[in-house]
Amino acid sequence: MARGPSLDTFISAADRALRALFAPPTAARPVPAPGPAAAREAQKTSDSALTPEEKRESAALMRVNHAGEVAAQALYHAQAMFARDGEVREFMLQAAREETDHLAWCETRLEELGSRPSVLNPLWYAGSFGIGTVAAMLGDRASLGFVAETERQVEGHLKSHLDLLPDADLRSRAIVEAMRHDEVGHGQHAQSAGGMRLPGPIRELMRQTARVMTHTAYRF
């Protein structure tokens, strides 16, 4: 019979939550930069060349992405905390570490654009931690299936942002593309590790929940 989380695990979870919400995130990987051809163009088109409207749009979209990464931290931490299998737990923790890079990249970009993260990040974290806990309690296959479906939806969301970001904002576009690549990898790993396909109503509920967060974080 699997043992429940220890007191140290709960303390560690609280520490991770405080770090995700209030401490500057530290990335293990550098902020993605445009490719060689795009980089040459980027030297001609700096942030100062973006119109005020383009800057506001980029900032709003990157704020949404930052909020999504806060939620991802909570989901992965909760699912790792209640995972039955050690390999599943390690996968969740490794994915959370990669999502920390995303969090740091988005925060850096928001600062460059003169903007800020969502003021509702504590709400996104708390809600996502609860959702991740429920998914993990249903068993590792359900938890992995939840990751696979979440990342599939996130990939679609990031692809839509590549269509919405101003063409001249090459820096934001490079960050979003690198994030998308990682999310695809997480989803594929979860699926190959035995993740079950979630029922249609659950997938739709996930879409609607993400839509609420996206629309709210865009503004606040």
Which residues does each predicted region cover?
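Non-heme di-metal
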Residues: 1-220
